[in-house]
């Protein structure tokens, strides 16, 4: 048996924040390193989306003609220009682990995950007020949105209309590490 050197785990290396987001922090007068320290201390991270109206052309199962409600910003597929869906909020859901069947006094072993609207008290404390439902962030006129979320927690999200009805529901779960500022272009 020979010992072989294993490559370092890339997920353990520090993530870098994209230059465009670094510029936004600088313009707002926020020291990015101090902000990331604050996030780490509170076991939080930031998820930012540059343009929620932009979708993957290969996704034909979800609505893809999206327009920011009350604004002209939209992304329309010229081959299929209708219908157009107005979106107003991005709503995050967190995976809560619940005990299996059996009741409170005699629970059976095991846990199951269930999606619940974001309710982590620390994350909710530091997010700005929203006009949307629980766990929502307003979509800005340029199509961008950002939210402080709990780190080390499985998260998913959906885009909702002005009545908080889900329009685009993501079918994947992600998690972040404390202090991370993660950006998605669409």
Regions found by a protein language model. Give the residues of each.
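Extended surface/linker regions that mediate inter-domain or inter-protein docking
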Residues: 1-186
């Amino acid at each position: 048996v020979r010992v072989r050197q294993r490559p370092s785990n890339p997920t353990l290396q520090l993530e870098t924040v994209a230059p465009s987001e670094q510029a936004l922090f600088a313009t707002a007068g926020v020291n990015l390193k101090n902000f990331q320290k604050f996030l780490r201390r509170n076991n939080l991270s930031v998820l930012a989306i540059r343009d929620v109206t932009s979708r993957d052309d290969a996704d034909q199962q979800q609505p893809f003609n999206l327009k920011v409600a009350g604004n002209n910003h939209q992304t329309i597929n010229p081959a299929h220009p209708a219908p157009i869906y107005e979106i107003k909020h991005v709503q995050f859901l967190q995976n809560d682990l619940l005990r299996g069947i059996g009741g409170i006094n005699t629970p059976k072993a095991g846990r199951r995950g269930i999606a619940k609207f974001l309710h982590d008290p620390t994350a909710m404390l530091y997010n700005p007020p929203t006009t949307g439902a629980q766990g929502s962030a307003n979509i800005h006129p340029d199509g961008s949105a950002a939210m402080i979320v709990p780190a080390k927690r499985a998260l998913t999200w959906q885009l909702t209309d002005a009545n908080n009805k889900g329009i685009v529901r993501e079918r994947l779960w992600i998690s972040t590490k404390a202090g991370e500022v993660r950006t998605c272009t669409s």
